[in-house]
């Protein structure tokens, strides 16, 4: 594995063709994101089937992340686009209307989430078109909210709206989201990204839907609201992973605060052994150009050095002019950055449980032995995640008896979820099967040294309590 930091790429019109998806995998994609803010179930199923077929042909494990759109707040339909000027009046009507100009320097619109208008107060701000236009609330009555525009900008139909100063209380999971979740369950996606999470309750609601359908899927909370930043500790505890979604976050909080918030969230996720994705506008210029800016390359590099498990491409791969090139640039940036990576963080974290002590010891011992790889025999994937937390400068190869578990590790830093073995209650048989499969697939050489972690009794989550050093003699024994 050339790189340890993983790449998530969004599938869209620019990347949906089989030959492009194939090249993106070859260039370094580990996880594909299906963005349910756009497209039909049939569209996403077609892309999902293509990804899985191509990954199988390439003998590569690729994870699937379903990004649930959530209650995105948008402008209603406009009769025609507005060219708003500083000082113009813009009224937000409580009823559904067709947005239009009603007088000189005076416009009216409606929004799709009307209950939010009841939560606004005088002097609060509304940001339109994903933050490009700012409006200040100056008057509120039973019919409308009156605002004054504070900067010039164009406004179109169905554009995003943010309320950074307003405490908003709306359901994070809409009926559309519930239908999309059922699609994800049916099609066995590996990760769910939940939009506009504000607290742990929002994660618990999704987990309850999964439980009602007798399934488990790793839930990633998208941090893009100010409330989420305030409640980050409880969100990390409740979720399986975190996505730092810097687009909306940079509207909800002053954008110059985003870098420090990103670093803090990554550190907290690392502390909790929860995978974290850094997302949005990482190589944004590649949506329209073949080359990235130096600042964008530095942005990717800094996210890697911060300790992110994965970096994500959005528009760059969904609608960009050359998605495979975007993946290649990101991959090369990661590889170069990891030459100066602060590996071996054995003393950076507190032990959360006894498994942490075992995994820290195994990562440390493997480094001291100059082992060629760590093999993690795992039922749930947690032991491999915990080893990765310490960032050893050697490959972590996950061995499991569940495709679902191995797929869930496709997003975790430094973990190669490569070896699928049969489930066994006999530890010796499990070790033999693991060593044989690893040698046959070319991940283990009989003349090298490895470290292996496992749990006894076998097949039980949370029982990692065993470390084995595998040298030539031990490998030969298990190959008998």
What are these regions, as identified by a protein language model?
Residues 1-480:
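Non-catalytic helical/linker scaffolds that mediate oligomerization, partner binding
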């Amino acid at each position: 594995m050339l790189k340890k930091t993983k790449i998530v790429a969004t599938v869209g019109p620019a990347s949906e063709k089989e030959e492009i998806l194939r090249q993106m995998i070859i260039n370094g994609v580990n996880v594909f994101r299906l963005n349910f803010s756009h497209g039909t179930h049939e569209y996403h199923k077609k892309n999902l089937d293509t990804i899985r077929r191509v990954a199988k042909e390439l003998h590569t494990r690729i994870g699937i992340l379903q990004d649930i759109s959530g209650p995105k707040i948008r402008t209603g339909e406009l009769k025609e686009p507005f060219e708003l000027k500083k000082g113009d009046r813009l009224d937000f009507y409580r009823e559904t209307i067709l947005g239009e100009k009603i007088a000189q320097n005076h416009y009216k619109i409606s929004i799709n989430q009307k209950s939010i208008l009841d939560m606004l107060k005088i002097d609060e701000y509304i940001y339109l078109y994903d933050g490009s236009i700012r409006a200040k609330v100056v008057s509120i009555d039973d019919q409308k909210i009156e605002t004054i525009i504070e900067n010039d900008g164009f406004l179109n139909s169905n554009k995003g709206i943010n309320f950074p100063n307003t405490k908003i209380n709306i359901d994070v999971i809409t009926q559309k989201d519930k239908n999309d979740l059922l699609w994800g369950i049916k099609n066995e996606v590996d990760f769910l990204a939940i939009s506009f999470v504000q607290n742990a309750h929002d994660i618990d609601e999704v987990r309850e839907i999964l439980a009602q359908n007798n399934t488990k899927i790793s839930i990633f909370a998208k941090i893009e609201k100010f409330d989420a930043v305030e409640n980050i500790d409880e969100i990390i505890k409740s979720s399986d992973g975190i996505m730092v979604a810097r687009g909306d976050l940079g509207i909800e909080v002053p954008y110059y605060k985003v870098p420090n918030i990103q670093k803090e969230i990554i550190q907290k996720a690392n502390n909790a052994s929860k995978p974290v994705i850094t997302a949005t506008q990482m190589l944004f210029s590649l949506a329209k150009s073949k080359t990235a800016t130096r600042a964008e390359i530095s942005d990717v590099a800094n996210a890697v050095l911060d300790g992110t498990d994965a970096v994500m491409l959005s528009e760059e791969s969904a609608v960009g002019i050359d998605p495979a090139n975007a993946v290649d640039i990101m991959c090369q940036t990661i590889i170069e950055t990891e030459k100066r990576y602060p590996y071996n963080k054995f003393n950076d974290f507190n032990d959360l449980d006894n498994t942490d002590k075992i995994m820290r010891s195994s990562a440390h011992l493997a480094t001291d032995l100059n082992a060629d790889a760590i093999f993690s025999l795992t039922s749930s994937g947690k032991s491999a995640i915990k080893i990765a937390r310490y960032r050893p400068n050697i490959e972590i190869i996950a061995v499991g008896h569940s495709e679902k578990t191995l797929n869930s590790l496709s997003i975790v830093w430094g973990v190669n979820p490569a070896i699928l073995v049969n489930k066994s209650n006999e530890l010796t048989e499990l070790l033999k099967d693991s060593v044989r499969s690893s040698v046959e697939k070319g991940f283990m050489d009989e003349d090298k040294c490895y470290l292996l972690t496992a749990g006894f009794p076998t097949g039980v989550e949370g029982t990692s309590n065993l470390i084995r050093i595998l040298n030539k003699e031990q490998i030969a024994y298990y190959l008998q």
